[in-house]
């Protein structure tokens, strides 16, 4: 196969910016990234790169990959969250202003995605490298989905280390907090709003929410700081004149290396009256040694 990958910095940079503009213009919400996966796959193939695909994950090995050498993974994601109501620009129209490229996913994590691809293409045809390179543009990062990087890691073999592109203000990150989503339900007694009722499920939920807001976990991580709990969703009632007997709310919990997700859930249950159930314990905090 003819090798077409560019090998000069200027061309790589210009191509990366154009690719990022094209990615921004295509909606790629988590689990709906098929069109950006198509674009990335086609782009690499046009550069002479043999690609592999599983669902919306695209990856490639450098041309002279050798099983005898250690391997570096270059990884970032091409899915995005949905734009919020505060957007002042069209999220799908890439705009260059004051030397910056604006658009949904330009920073998280399109910039890193195309930069790592440029680095991969630069070394793609190189001979006598000390390391192999694998480039992986993966899906479902924003929703911590099961069909993202976790699902394709077995295809990569043993890795010496990975460079994962995320917007960290160009600071090396060696640890990340875990994530646990907890669904809670406060109970009360239903009645007409005109009647006296001191067992309003909403008020009962608010007492628990106040504890969640103010509680400080005793142990603080040297690298990750404190466990953070934030109530992000609350629902109750359907009629203005009826006191609801249930109030549900959701807690976004960011855990550290000081507590497992299961330990945090146990602490929550011991301190609130609402029922509390974790959607998953899968995403505990992770880190590598400070002197790595």
Question: For each predicted feature, which ranges?
Answer:
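Metal-dependent amide/peptide-bond hydrolase catalytic core
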Residues: 4, 11, 174, 183-292
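A structural signal for short hydrophobic beta-strand segments in well-ordered beta-sheet cores
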Residues: 51, 94-96, 231-234
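Active-site beta-loop-alpha junctions enriched in small/polar residues
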Residues: 29, 77-79, 140, 168, ...
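Active-site metal-coordination/substrate-binding segment of hydrolases
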Residues: 69-134
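N-terminal helical capping/dimerization or prosegment-like subdomains
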Residues: 2-83, 246-250, 264-267
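Short helix-capping segments at alpha-helix termini
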Residues: 47, 126-129, 275
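Acidic/histidine-rich catalytic neighborhood of metal-dependent amide-processing enzymes
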Residues: 109-181, 185
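Short glycine/serine- and small hydrophobic-enriched flexible loop segments
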Residues: 22, 118-125, 207-214
């Amino acid at each position: 196969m003819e090798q077409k990958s560019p090998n000069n910095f200027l061309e790589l940079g210009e191509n990366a910016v154009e690719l990022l503009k094209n990615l921004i213009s295509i909606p790629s919400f988590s689990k709906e990234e098929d069109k950006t996966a198509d674009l990335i796959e086609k782009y690499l193939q046009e550069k002479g790169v043999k690609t592999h695909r599983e669902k919306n994950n695209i990856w490639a090995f450098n041309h002279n990959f050798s099983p005898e050498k250690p391997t570096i993974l270059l990884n970032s994601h091409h899915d995005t969250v949905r734009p919020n109501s505060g957007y002042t620009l069209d999220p799908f129209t890439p705009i260059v202003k004051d030397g910056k490229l604006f658009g949904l996913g330009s920073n998280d994590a399109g910039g890193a995605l195309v930069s790592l691809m440029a680095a991969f293409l630069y070394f793609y045809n190189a001979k006598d490298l000390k390391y192999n390179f694998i480039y992986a543009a993966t899906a479902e990062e924003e929703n911590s989905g099961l069909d993202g990087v976790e699902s394709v890691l077995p295809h990569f073999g043993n890795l010496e280390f990975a460079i994962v592109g995320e917007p960290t203000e160009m600071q090396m990150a060696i640890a990340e907090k875990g994530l646990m989503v907890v669904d809670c339900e406060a109970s009360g007694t239903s009645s007409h709003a005109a009647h006296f009722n001191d067992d309003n499920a909403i008020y009962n939920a608010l007492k628990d929410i106040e504890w969640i807001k103010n509680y400080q976990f005793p142990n603080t991580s040297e690298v990750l700081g404190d466990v953070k709990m934030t109530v992000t969703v609350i629902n109750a009632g359907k009629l203005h004149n009826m006191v609801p007997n249930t109030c549900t709310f959701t807690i976004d919990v960011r855990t550290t290396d000081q507590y497992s997700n299961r330990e945090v859930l146990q602490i929550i249950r011991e301190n609130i009256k609402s029922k509390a159930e974790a959607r998953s314990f899968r995403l505990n905090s992770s880190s590598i040694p400070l002197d790595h």
